[in-house]
Amino acid sequence: MSATDPTVVLGTIGSDAHAVGITLLDHALREAGFTVHNLGAQTAKTEFATAAADHDADAVLVSSLYGHAQQDCAGLHDQLAAAGVDATTVVGGNLAVGQTDFETVKQRFEEMGFDRVFSAQTGFEAVVDAVKTELDVDERSPTTTTLGA
């Protein structure tokens, strides 16, 4: 982890155009003292990997609400490794379509290499707390990095 505030790269993966949740999570992370690089909606795996490498990210947070996260996230960890990124990875949202129970979905994403997996019903505070735990972060003051920087 970097010597300064912990850095996260955040975005909505694949063709998913939902951006409200990541914008709210962006604000919650900043309030908790994280430096956030919000890639926005419809972000390719390669963009996550490049941004994580460029910003020396401590964590990569991936959102998906349209139910196709498994397809969109396939190979993400390979892309991160190829870019030299060794960061905590978190995925959350409505990750699968149909009647699949969340524990089954969670197991699939953990098998893909994600450190934390959250359902769409998870509150922002729980995600922030989990990222803090993963990164062993103490309370810090908020940063002033601009949205999308």
From Swiss-Prot:
Catalytic activity field: (2S,3S)-3-methyl-L-aspartate = L-glutamate
Entry coiled-coil feature ranges: none
EC code: 5.4.99.1
Binding residues for adenosylcob(III)alamin: S15, D16, A17, H18, A19, S63, S64, L65, N94, L95, A96, V97, G98
Record key words, sorted: Cobalamin, Cobalt, Isomerase, Metal-binding
Alphabetized PROSITE patterns for the sequence: B12_BINDING
GO molecular function, one term: metal ion binding
Cofactor: adenosylcob(III)alamin
Pathway of action: Amino-acid degradation; L-glutamate degradation via mesaconate pathway; acetate and pyruvate from L-glutamate: step 1/4
Top-level division of the source organism's lineage: Archaea
Enzyme class: isomerase
Residue ranges of every copy of the B12-binding domain listed in the record: 5-138
One Pfam family from the record: B12-binding
Record-level GO BP terms: anaerobic glutamate catabolic process; glutamate catabolic process via L-citramalate
HAMAP family: Me_Asp_mutase_S
Assembly and interaction partners: Heterotetramer composed of 2 epsilon subunits (GlmE) and 2 sigma subunits (GlmS). GlmE exists as a homodimer and GlmS as a monomer.
Role description: Catalyzes the carbon skeleton rearrangement of L-glutamate to L-threo-3-methylaspartate ((2S,3S)-3-methylaspartate).
Family recorded in the similarity comment: Belongs to the methylaspartate mutase GlmS subunit family.
Protein's name according to its UniProt entry: Glutamate mutase sigma subunit
Species: Halobacterium salinarum (strain ATCC 700922 / JCM 11081 / NRC-1)
Lineage: Archaea, Methanobacteriati, Methanobacteriota, Stenosarchaea group, Halobacteria
